[in-house]
Amino acid sequence: MWFNPRMSKNFRVVALIGKYQSPEVAEAVLRIAEFLRVRGLDVWIEQGTASSIGMAGQFAVASYEEIGAQADLAVVLGGDGTMLNTARRLSQHGVPLVGINQGRLGFLTDISRDEALPKLGEILEGRYTEESRAMLDAEVLRAGHRVFQTLALNDVVINKGDLGRMIEFDLSIDGEFVYTQRSDGMILATPTGSTAYALSANGPILHPNVGGIALVPLCPHALTARPVTLPDTSHIEIVLLPQHDARIHFDGQARFDARAGDRLRVTRSPDVVRLLHPQGYSYFAMLREKLHWSATPRRP
């Protein structure tokens, strides 16, 4: 295979991060690792990935902290869930991410497994488009003390707890009371998360370049409670009212069990996720494909 020795000059250390316990990902990780090694790159396998797919000893193994500190590029193999987890762990380090789709929809992992090697080759040669995705910084306060904090790339969701009944909460924005809502919960979504859970709850699609946070009620008791898009400079606070418990989910991966009186505070994080796409990537083409826009109804 032809190789340009000037390629990859900006990517010397490449980390591979794969979905755990997936035979298909194991094969893809090995194939891509060999592809990168032939090009003279230092290949690191994230330690959980290496352990899960049995590659320890074949390549250098590194923790997320080591990848964040020293890797020039991280290639994520899996679905959007794997990318969300990786993004939260590496965003503070500024490591650019490339997504190889081994899952289903793949809004974030936009390179198909069949095109992985040629598309990676293009990116290593510098032929790519880079974009930054906003994240949310969320914290929970109890009796004035912070008891939980994390980041989210997609969304923060507060919803009903074990009893399965509606919850009631106060919503304030920038210190101003907005309303008291009774509902199954609320989704706070980034532009990236606007095509996830928020979309299925009739929320708006926000272009990634829009500086906004979507508030999408879940089955509100008042039918006039509609989705609202706020500037991403907003400070959002939700206070869970008495006699209600709730669960708060972050990107559908981390969870916190909230009690009455707990305060959920959400702002835009100063950290961003750097995504690299092959040349020719189009956000609207991606939506058209994933959401089946322009599809012609067919008779059975």
Curated annotation (Swiss-Prot):
Sorted alphabetically, which Pfam families does this protein's record hold? Answer: NAD_kinase, NAD_kinase_C
Keyword Cell membrane in record: no
Q: Where is the active site?
A: D80 (proton acceptor)
Binding residue positions for NAD(+): D80, G81, N154, D155, R165, R182, D184, T195, A196, Y197, A198, L199, S200, Q253
Q: Where in the cell is it found?
A: Cytoplasm
Q: Does the keyword Ligase apply?
A: no
Question: Might you report a single GO cellular component term?
Answer: cytoplasm
Reactions catalysed, semicolon-separated, are: NAD(+) + ATP = ADP + NADP(+) + H(+)
> Which family, according to the similarity comment?
Belongs to the NAD kinase family.
In Swiss-Prot or TrEMBL terms, this protein is called NAD kinase
GO molecular function term, any single one? metal ion binding
Choose any GO biological process term that the UniProt entry carries and state it.
NAD metabolic process
Protein's job: Involved in the regulation of the intracellular balance of NAD and NADP, and is a key enzyme in the biosynthesis of NADP. Catalyzes specifically the phosphorylation on 2'-hydroxyl of the adenosine moiety of NAD to yield NADP.
List UniProt keywords, sorted A-Z: ATP-binding, Cytoplasm, Kinase, NAD, NADP, Nucleotide-binding, Transferase
Reported EC number(s) for this entry are 2.7.1.23
Identify the taxonomic lineage of the organism of origin.
Bacteria, Pseudomonadati, Pseudomonadota, Betaproteobacteria, Rhodocyclales
Cofactor(s) of this protein: a divalent metal cation
Q: Which residues form a coiled coil?
A: none
Principal localization reads cytoplasm
